[in-house]
Amino acid sequence: MIDIKAWAEYVVEWAAKDPYGFLTTVILALTPLFIASALLSWKLAKMIEAKDREQKKKQKRQENIAKAKRAKKD
């Protein structure tokens, strides 16, 4: 079984002995996650904008239908 305490001590020792190598490794490991996060955020923003446009379009249509019905009654 993996000894987490020993692994954590190894990582801390590695970071203390070679901080630039440690930071480089961490940044390289996290970069794909940052890219994925940015891509998913962008896609979500586009989906929300499309949904808002569709809702505004439906609301405008309903208002026009209601206006036309009122005009027919008069």
Curated annotation (Swiss-Prot):
Q: Which residue intervals are annotated with compositional bias (Basic and acidic residues) in the record?
A: 53-66
Instruction: List all membrane-crossing ranges.
Output: 20-40
Upper classification of the source organism reads: Eukaryota, Metazoa, Chordata, Craniata, Vertebrata
Q: Which family does it belong to?
A: Belongs to the SMIM15 family.
- Positions the record marks as coiled coil are 42-74
Q: Is Aminoacyl-tRNA synthetase among this UniProt entry's keywords?
A: no
Q: Which Pfam families match?
A: UPF0542
Q: Which InterPro entries does this chain map to?
A: Smim15
What's the protein called, per UniProt?
A: Small integral membrane protein 15
Is Membrane among the key words of this record?
A: yes
Q: What cellular component terms from Gene Ontology apply here?
A: membrane
Compartments, as annotated in UniProt: Membrane
Q: What membrane topology is given?
A: Single-pass membrane protein
User: Keywords assigned by UniProt?
Assistant: Coiled coil, Membrane, Transmembrane, Transmembrane helix
Disordered: annotated span: 53-74
